[in-house]
Amino acid sequence: MVNVLYELNFNWIESVPYIIPLFVGIGFFFTFKWYPSQNPGTDQKCSKGYVGYVVAKWVGWIVGTFAFCLFVLLTIAHVVDYREKREILDNNHAIVVEGMVEKYHAQPLSGHDTEHFEINGIYFEYSSGELLNGYNTPACYGGVIKENGQHLKIKYLKDDIGNNIILYIEEIE
């Protein structure tokens, strides 16, 4: 009997950290609106605080624009990465390994380590702290790979630095 334990899916919750630059950008965009309210008259050219207002305005626009662009680029990169991996999985271009889980090492609940194991000499490693499209849920957080001896079929790909990214996990009983 075959039991699908994991299949690559787009998880919006993993995109949440990318929103941080967006909020930083919005905050800096509105700095020049806030500055005159805290320092009345500084938005007038003849006032003593005008230079501070101009600096706040330019810093707000520059940092805000940079943070917004960072948000857009990170989000686009995350979506494109998912689509590429999904296409590899859907077109059966993923590497397949089947066998028993060996040398299993669980990630501790403290999270200061990785979870890793081997199947037929192929090494897999992941951590809950990774923002990636692919399997990265350790057993201590409800992951599906829990112990040595599990008979699994895994579809994966190698990334640019040689890590094996898990796209699909099937338990064979």
Model regions: which residues?
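Alpha-helical transmembrane spans
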Residues: V2-E87
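Structural detector for short beta-strands of small beta-barrel domains
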Residues: N92-D113
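OB-fold (S1/OB) nucleic-acid-binding surfaces
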Residues: L109-L132
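Hydrophobic alpha-helical transmembrane segments and immediately flanking/interface helices
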Residues: K85-I95, E130
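OB-fold/S1-family single-stranded nucleic acid-binding modules
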Residues: K155-E173
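Extracytoplasmic
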Residues: V96, E147-K153, I161-N164
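Short nucleic-acid-contacting surface segments enriched for D/E, G, S/T with interspersed K/R
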Residues: L132-K155
